[in-house]
């Protein structure tokens, strides 16, 4: 079945490449709607309003006043609560006479239990607006709190992605939510995605709906100057893979099924010509600035550029989606044993999200290049590879080698073995990947359980 799907997709791509190249017909995604079709014919872009600028956080009190907010929930984590980003938010709220309550119990890499704790706080508070100050964990938790407090009769699994949850469409009105990201990675301020660990299954899953997108994202690059080295690196790897995966994802008009109602069109729709622009631009910024941002905390140009790149990639993948690196990362993070990442002040073992994503990237892109080799070569070139004499059939190996060098230069752990996994863990890792259909089905190349096992095995060592 997987082989048959690959053959069909490969044939369609060949037809696209051979089609007329005049300006009127050269768009490889152009396709008219066909009544009753099984594959998609449309895509849509949904992003938050974004405001960028140094010290722009000082405007948040005025924003909440303009929204008519009288009782605001501010969410953050215990590492941030005494630091300047949260202080800047609270000072602005006080200055503008906005009443608020502070919730600082967000868990880094949230779980269903930590989500439910925040949801209970939100339900009791009867808030009319939300503010999330932190990384993706904080902003995602804030999205969930807003959703379930606005739909108090819903069961927790109602809105969770299938097959773990029911994946119901969000039809209730939500309260305004302003996101203030303090890391340069998740792009959560731009997306309708909230990710968490479902502890019963030791699997990562999430909620995906345009309805939970933040109303406004305040992109204040000053907040990145205090990020520790490994947090900068791992956050940047998330941007890297968001860009690569969305650019190489299954094209939107090859995705099925086509929804019978636009409300059922998924947030992750497949690569498309608008997301492509954002993904490639973000990738260029990563190539130019990530190493500088990691190595020199005083390099304001690099740190500020990476903060924007996170949002750029968020616009891209928030509509196109991601695929195998992310799908495989969820069990890597969820089955963590004793590994504790440097520069993360947490009370539990942790493989940071960006690290769990990037460790499989050489193996994944070596595997997926068969279906869209030109895009893989283009990505390798952006990351510094010389492709002038490259052959199409070498695309996967070239991108994989380019990624390995990039990761080696940034002192990334030597594969899954370095974060505590052995080949004996592969069956559990594969099992944890299988429920991630929301993202894995966007891989440009179909895959079997055996092939997933092979990718995990190939990722045990990188160098």
Swiss-Prot record:
Gene Ontology biological process: glutamate catabolic process via 2-hydroxyglutarate; lipid metabolic process
Catalysed reactions, semicolon-separated: (S)-3-hydroxybutanoate + 2-oxoglutarate = (R)-2-hydroxyglutarate + acetoacetate; 4-hydroxybutanoate + 2-oxoglutarate = (R)-2-hydroxyglutarate + succinate semialdehyde
Domain of life of the source: Eukaryota
Compartment(s): Mitochondrion
EC number: 1.1.99.24
GO molecular-function terms, A-Z: alcohol dehydrogenase (NAD+) activity; hydroxyacid-oxoacid transhydrogenase activity; metal ion binding
GO cellular component: mitochondrion
Protein name: Hydroxyacid-oxoacid transhydrogenase, mitochondrial
Organism field: Xenopus tropicalis
Lineage: Eukaryota, Metazoa, Chordata, Craniata, Vertebrata
The encoding gene: adhfe1
